[in-house]
Structure formats: structure tokens, C-alpha cells
């Protein structure tokens, strides 16, 4: 029998003051807890009151992590009852503070696996040790080179994997005993960390090239061998590594990169929701991306695939896309184009004034986009002039300033709504309160990846899918984009975070059905909805 102290220290089985008198007797816990036996809801209410006494968001997050480290059921029950309030604290943006201060704040490893680039021989044993006999179905891994908007944070980025898994569980209901957070410590190029005596990771510059990719390959092989029904989620890798890794494994295993695919899927869902409101077709739209990095190009790729799915040829679809970066409109003769940008760069010969298209305003005037999406982190770049220009040639311009945090957004939703006389269909990267405009409350959809990746992954896991295909991704986007209320003035293009659990199930069912339809399920499934519901974990004792 497990010794009593170990039971109280194991967050998977600890109930704290909710252990009954009979359980306390049986498990040897008599005298180790206060006399009162609490119901789970009593614990939740008490813990929430303690949470409310904390002042800063960082203090609140550290408190919640103490609960997580102690009692998973209590943590997730509390989180599920306060999703809207807790999401920005458990995850983005507050998680950035704990990542930047991880070494100074370090208390315990939170069940994560720490892989050292210099010790590939330890990959298998590390994963085994961290899993501790659990049946791992979902693994979130990061090398933390491109964390959120804050860059390279080395081993401290493990927090992003831990936080991501928390969202998976509260949104979709993945059992926390079947997930594992992994960080690959490949060094860091962050000088602040390299000079910090308290930094807990490897103190050398990032390893690149064959040694790095060989390590990744060994990791994938060991993970697949140890956990045969695995869904592998890559998080916050650097730009070049992210796409190389995804391209290497997406046709071999069920795998997903949130930075490349997640933002693309949720923006596609938002665009589909906007088009449902306006009654227009995607294949009639002209798309402009302001920002052509990992996120921007991930969105372009997703919408391009959807246009092809809707009947355009590959080349026809490409003509609907235009990229604007810091140097202006990107042209096909630019020697610095990335492999992702090259297929979508404009032909210089198509523009008489090509040399003058060196900023967003000029590009908008030349191209006349009907959809404008910002991932540039250049604040206030969607100007009144641009919004009014778009509103002049398209009835319902789709404008998504999704850079975050708020101070980096390309425009404020309220301004875009006002400048377009209420015509713009808006998505943002941060939560926005309802906006009163001409007697109506306009709801603003948040293009938050958390709307999509939990249901997407859960559906693939429920179907025991061998791969995550473009068709499954498209099914996810359509299921989310189909939730909008087209009868209501000011309806949001995406559903609210408050309904996260409900529509995560909708997404999961759509994805699982598509996997079964494509014959990708490892085991026969007669009833997809039942398979999804049977997998769902509820936080209860």
C-alpha cells in the first residue's frame, strides 16, 4: 500500500480534506488532516476565496499552480467554474511572467520531462520516468525558442507545455493522467539567461543542424514506441525548426504544431464565421496578411488549402493572397523570401507602381483586400484611412488585428467598428468586451487558439487516429465557424471562451468523424459521439 504521506503528495490521487472518515482509516491518514470532511464544492469555494485575496495576476497564477501541484481534481473543478477569469492567468498573458522568472520561482517540476540535447541516450528513460507507468495519449513538447511574443527562454519554457495541457483538460476534458509536458533543453541564445547564475538550464548557445534534428528524431521514435496511441503537439519552436519538424512527421504520425496550424485554423474558423454572417463565399475574397512570419504564413496556408478544398486550383487560389511585411508588399523576386512566403509572393509585373508599395497603406490601395489579418505586432498599423478605404469597396470588410498582447495589436476593435460604420466583421487576438454602437451590442470574437486545439486533439485521440490530416483540420474549422448566430446584429465571428467546453466537444466530434471517414482510426468505432464522450474526464472524486 502507498504510504500516507505519498498519497497526500500525489496530485493525481490526493483529495485533501475531502477524504472520507472511512478512507482516512483505510489509507492511514488519520490525524494527518483536519477533522472536517469537505465536499469538493466546499473545497472549490474555499480555494476561490483564497484566490480572490491575491493581488497581482502573477501572485494568482503561483497560487493556482500550488493547487495544481497538490490536487488535480480540485484545480480543474475550480478552473472549469471560472474559465473566462482564469484563462489569462493560467495561460497567456500571465504565463509569460512565470516563464521569464521560472528559475527564480522554481519550486517543483510539475511532472514534466526535461530532455538534455547532450544526452540523447537518456531520452527513453526520461520519458519513462516522467510517465511513471501512466498511459500517455497527449504529449506537448517545446524547445522554447519562440515563446509567445517573448522569444527564447530556454528550459524555462517548460511552463508553456504545462500550461497548454491545462487548457486541453479544462476545454476538452482530456484526463490529466494521460498527458505529459516535455521540454527539450537545446541551450539558449538569450544572453540574460546565459549570464544568470540562477538559470536552471544548459548554459550554451542553441544547438543547430544535424545534432539537433537527430535528437528530435530519436525523441519522436522513443515517444511513439513508449506511447503507441500518441498525439504529439509541438509548441513554440523557432521559425525554421517549427516548419521543418512538422513537415518531417505530419505524414507519419498524429502530430500538430499550434504556432503554424493552430492560429491558421482558428482564423479560418473566424473567417468562415464572418462569411456566414455576410453571406459571401471564401473563393471570392482577396486576402492580405500583414506579417509574414510563422503565424501569418500558417494562416495563409490554411486559408489557401480551404480555397482549394472549395474548388479552386492550387495556382488560382494563390492569386487570392498578398503578403505585407516590414518592407511592404512581398514580391517574387525578393531574395530573402522564406520557403513559406515564396509561393504566395506577388508578381512584380502585375503592379505598375510596385516600387512604391513599401507600406501597408499603399498595398491596401493597390490590392483592395476584402480580408485583412494582422500578425505583425506593429501597434496601430490598421489606420482609420485603411479601414475606411476597405469599407468603400467591400460591403462587410473582414478585419482581424490579432497580434497580442493588447499593446501590440494592429488596431482596437472599437476603432475598427467606428471607422467602418459598424460594417467590419472583427476578430482580435485578445479578449474584448462587448462594444455599444448605435444602440446595439457588438460582440467581438477572439481568435484564440484555445478555441480549436483542445477539441482538435481530443477528437484525434478519441478516434485513435494514425494521422492529423488537412481534412480533419478543415472539419475542425468548419465546426467552429458554423457556431455563429447569423440572425443577431453584432454577432461575434467566433464563439466565446465561456462556452469552451461545449464547442470543444463539437470540434472533437467533427474531427473524430472525419478521421473515421478517412479510415485512420486504429480500432473500429461504431458510434463516434459515444467514443468522444467516453474519453471525457470530469474533475470529481
From Swiss-Prot:
It is an enzyme of class 4 (lyase). Mn(2+) binds at residues 235-236, 259. GO terms for molecular function: carboxy-lyase activity; malic enzyme activity; malolactic enzyme activity; manganese ion binding; NAD binding; oxidoreductase activity, acting on the CH-OH group of donors, NAD or NADP as acceptor. L-lactate and ethanol are non-competitive inhibitors, whereas succinate, citrate, and D-tartrate show competitive type inhibitions. Substrate binds at residues 164, 449. Optimum temperature is between 37 and 45 degrees Celsius. Optimum pH is between 5 and 6. One of its GO terms (biological process) is malolactic fermentation. NAD(+) binds at residues 292-295, 404, 449. InterPro entries: Aminoacid_DH-like_N_sf, Malic_enzyme_CS, Malic_N_dom, Malic_N_dom_sf, Malic_NAD-bd, Malic_OxRdtase, Malolactic_enz, NAD(P)-bd_dom_sf. Its cofactor is Mn(2+); NAD(+). It comes from the Bacteria. The active site is at 91 (proton donor), 164 (proton acceptor). It catalyses: (S)-malate + H(+) = (S)-lactate + CO2. Its EC number is 4.1.1.101. Keywords: Lyase, Manganese, Metal-binding, NAD. One of its GO terms (cellular component) is cytosol. Belongs to the malic enzymes family. Involved in the malolactic fermentation (MLF) of wine, which results in a natural decrease in acidity and favorable changes in wine flavors. Catalyzes the decarboxylation of L-malate to L-lactate. It can also use pyruvate as substrate. Homodimer. This is Malolactic enzyme. It comes from Oenococcus oeni. The gene is mleA.
Amino acid at each position: 500500500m502507498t504510504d500516507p504521506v505519498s498519497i497526500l503528495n500525489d496530485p493525481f490521487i490526493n483529495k485533501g480534506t475531502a477524504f472520507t472518515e472511512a478512507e482516512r482509516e483505510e489509507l492511514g491518514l488519520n490525524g494527518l488532516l483536519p477533522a472536517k470532511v469537505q465536499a469538493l464544492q466546499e473545497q472549490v469555494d474555499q480555494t476561490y476565496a483564497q484566490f480572490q485575496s491575491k493581488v497581482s495576476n502573477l501572485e494568482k497564477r503561483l497560487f493556482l499552480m500550488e493547487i495544481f501541484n497538490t490536487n488535480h481534481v480540485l484545480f480543474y473543478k475550480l478552473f472549469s467554474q471560472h474559465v473566462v477569469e482564469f484563462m489569462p492567468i493560467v495561460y497567456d498573458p500571465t504565463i509569460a511572467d512565470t516563464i521569464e522568472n521560472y528559475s527564480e520561482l522554481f519550486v517543483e517540476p510539475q511532472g514534466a520531462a526535461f530532455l538534455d540535447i547532450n544526452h540523447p541516450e537518456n531520452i527513453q528513460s526520461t520519458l519513462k520516468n516522467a510517465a511513471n507507468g501512466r498511459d500517455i495519449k497527449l504529449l506537448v513538447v517545446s524547445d522554447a525558442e519562440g515563446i509567445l511574443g517573448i522569444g527564447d527562454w530556454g528550459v524555462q519554457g517548460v511552463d508553456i507545455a504545462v500550461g497548454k495541457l491545462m487548457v486541453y483538460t479544462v476545454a476538452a476534458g482530456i484526463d490529466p493522467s494521460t498527458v505529459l509536458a516535455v521540454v527539450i533543453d537545446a541551450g539558449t541564445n538569450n544572453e540574460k539567461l546565459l549570464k544568470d547564475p540562477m538559470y536552471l538550464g544548459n548554459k550554451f548557445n542553441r544547438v543547430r543542424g544535424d545534432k539537433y534534428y537527430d535528437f528530435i528524431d530519436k525523441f519522436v521514435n522513443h515517444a511513439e514506441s513508449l506511447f503507441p496511441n500518441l498525439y504529439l503537439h509541438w509548441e513554440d519552436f523557432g521559425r525554421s525548426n517549427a516548419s521543418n519538424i512538422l513537415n518531417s512527421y505530419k505524414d507519419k504520425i498524429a502530430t500538430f504544431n499550434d504556432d503554424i496550424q493552430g492560429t491558421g485554423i482558428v482564423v479560418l474558423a473566424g473567417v468562415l464565421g464572418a462569411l456566414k454572417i455576410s453571406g459571401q463565399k471564401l473563393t471570392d475574397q482577396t486576402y492580405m496578411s500583414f506579417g509574414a512570419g510563422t503565424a501569418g504564413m500558417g494562416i495563409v496556408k490554411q486559408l489557401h488549402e480551404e480555397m482549394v478544398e472549395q474548388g479552386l486550383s492550387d495556382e488560382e487560389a494563390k492569386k487570392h493572397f498578398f503578403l505585407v511585411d516590414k518592407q511592404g508588399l512581398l514580391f517574387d523576386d525578393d531574395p530573402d523570401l522564406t520557403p513559406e512566403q515564396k509561393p504566395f509572393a506577388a508578381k512584380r509585373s502585375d503592379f505598375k507602381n510596385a516600387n512604391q508599395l513599401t507600406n501597408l497603406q499603399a498595398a491596401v490601395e493597390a490590392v483592395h483586400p476584402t480580408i485583412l489579418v494582422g500578425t505583425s505586432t506593429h501597434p496601430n498599423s490598421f489606420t482609420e484611412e485603411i479601414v475606411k478605404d476597405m469599407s468603400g469597396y467591400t460591403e462587410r470588410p473582414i478585419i482581424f488585428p490579432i497580434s497580442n498582447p493588447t499593446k501590440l495589436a494592429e488596431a482596437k476593435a472599437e476603432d475598427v467598428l467606428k471607422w467602418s460604420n459598424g460594417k467590419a466583421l472583427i476578430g482580435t487576438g485578445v479578449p474584448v468586451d462587448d462594444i455599444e454602437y448605435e444602440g446595439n451590442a457588438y460582440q467581438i470574437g477572439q481568435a484564440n487558439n484555445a478555441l480549436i486545439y483542445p477539441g482538435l486533439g481530443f477528437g484525434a485521440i478519441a478516434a485513435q487516429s494514425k494521422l492529423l490530416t488537412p481534412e480533419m483540420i478543415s472539419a475542425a474549422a468548419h465546426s467552429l465557424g458554423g457556431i455563429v448566430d447569423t440572425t443577431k446584429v453584432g454577432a461575434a465571428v467566433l464563439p466565446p471562451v465561456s462556452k469552451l467546453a461545449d464547442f470543444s466537444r463539437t470540434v472533437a466530434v467533427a474531427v473524430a468523424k472525419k478521421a473515421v471517414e478517412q479510415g485512420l482510426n486504429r480500432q473500429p468505432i461504431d458510434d463516434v459521439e459515444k467514443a468522444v464522450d467516453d474519453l471525457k474526464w470530469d474533475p470529481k472524486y
